[in-house]
């Protein structure tokens, strides 16, 4: 039951029950006062917590904005760029959200805290003052009555009458005060219902506004969120394929590390301990150096390096070798030692220690010592035998039979081309298809003997068994270029142009296959094979680099993008000629007039080695790989859906002349740098047809160059590795800005002054020092002083 009403007539009776009702009203107001006081305190704490949360959110957003993903390789996919930008988008979202939260926090003070404080002080405070007056007047009234009633009846009448009048006046005043107090009590009880709740409504309205703004921000963000989810899924799919390829390459190198040494400008390189002699009585010390030797020039370079000291490079030392002599164990108390004598330091020899006897023999062979008995570090590239799959009439028949069967029987099968068949069945089907006698007998469209997954796996295996990928080794790097940069339209234009540069048979088969893949993607709601999924499956199948490296595997994602572009633009690319009004793509090279680097020369091409899943009908028994048994589970055949790329024609330069993988035996000493082959066409001009060409060391647009005549693989030592004859030591000033694209080159702005400028063995390049760092400078970018 609620509070009983206070009747004004009861003010004159002032009964005990009236007083009880007043005390109940007073207690309720006191409880209300304490509640409002506590609520104000909690509200201020809420504001403080909101500000703390907002500061933490802003700090979190700031951290997101400042972080940037690094990537492996020289470019990112569109998906990766969107993922990189997502952190900034998240940061902006939080920033906008916190701006709304700040507005809400300010409104809490104005709409809740201040009105409640005003109500508590002005209204409840006024009642407290009225209560004090009422209590004081009550005490005074009844004290006066007690005193008046104690007057003796023997007093004079005039005195008694005066006392009666005074008491009556006091009682009237008490009644007036009592009436006002009762009125005030009931007024406050009613007023608090809106004076207190109205600020609460305003407070919640502010909260509703904040949450509505958050909802609107989330609604605006939803489209980006959906796109980002697709980007993440595409990147995850590519990662799964890339990881399996990296692990496969790692296992190959783990099993035969010597068969996978990478080509280098140096005939030999590795760690050696070098004896540093000191004056008596200090003896000598052995310091680890990374040594590099070029046999043709007899140039020996050694750089001190200690892994435990933070990996800092010391000052390098260069000399020209005169002779190398093996140290006998009775002449030194260390094993695996040999002496080298420098031609430019008469009478001075250095004692070096290899890590093992085998390494010492290898160094002695390369350096011209007496124990040249074992194979050296480097290995020549020997092509391995290929499978019997060919791009001929039989190949087109196989392709068309498989495609007809897939489109007739399994166009809606989930995971089409991703689900792999049993290896033995796939090999048997492909063998029958490639045999002229049995090919016509194979009925793929009606026979239940061949599952759809077996047919799709056979189709992919045929394409991977070709001596050269369908999109050719020669154009592999050119197809990768537009996938790494430019707008979507410019990418399509560049790939459109490059497809029409393919050999006619390659283009015809690619047309048939891509048309089929377009049909498959049109049924993606049923088979779940979107364009992105088909790109993951067929990217490594249609495009393979020549060398099997981690850099090549990192380019898998760009191969997938090229295949996606082919599928999405099949009609335009294969049914129309390239736009003649657009400039022909030029080679991806250094800027106009910039000298080429020897370290950027391409090595001689070799055929792709046969992988374990390639068709091996013509291999000798001793070389025949073992095939999985009939009951091999599909999970063991994942390589059928994600074939291993065997190379990468890398566009970046991770190290000097280290972009070629050596796979077979040969003499390291006989190896020499190769001359540049025909300049590769690229799609740079397609990507930025309007951009001006500014001098830069970075790749830029140049006019298409004529084909260069082939140059023999091995160059004479006098040409390839001749030490510099004319050495200058002058200053030079930069006349163009340059951005280095390799760690051995210098970046600089116009007007930079170089010290100690000398000629370099790299034709068209100089060596100089800028700000304490020494490196290569394009000769036509500077003016000698």
UniProtKB/Swiss-Prot annotation:
Annotated positions for site Arginine finger: 418
Bias (Basic residues) ranges: 598-608
Regions of compositional bias (Basic and acidic residues) in chain numbering: 622-632
UniProt domain BAR: residue ranges: 7-262
Signal peptide coordinates: none
Residues covered by the Rho-GAP domain: 389-574
Matches recorded under SUPFAM superfamilies: BAR/IMD domain-like, GTPase activation domain, GAP, PH domain-like, SH3-domain
Region (Disordered) residue spans: 576-708
Protein name (record): Rho GTPase-activating protein 10
Source organism of this protein record: Bos taurus
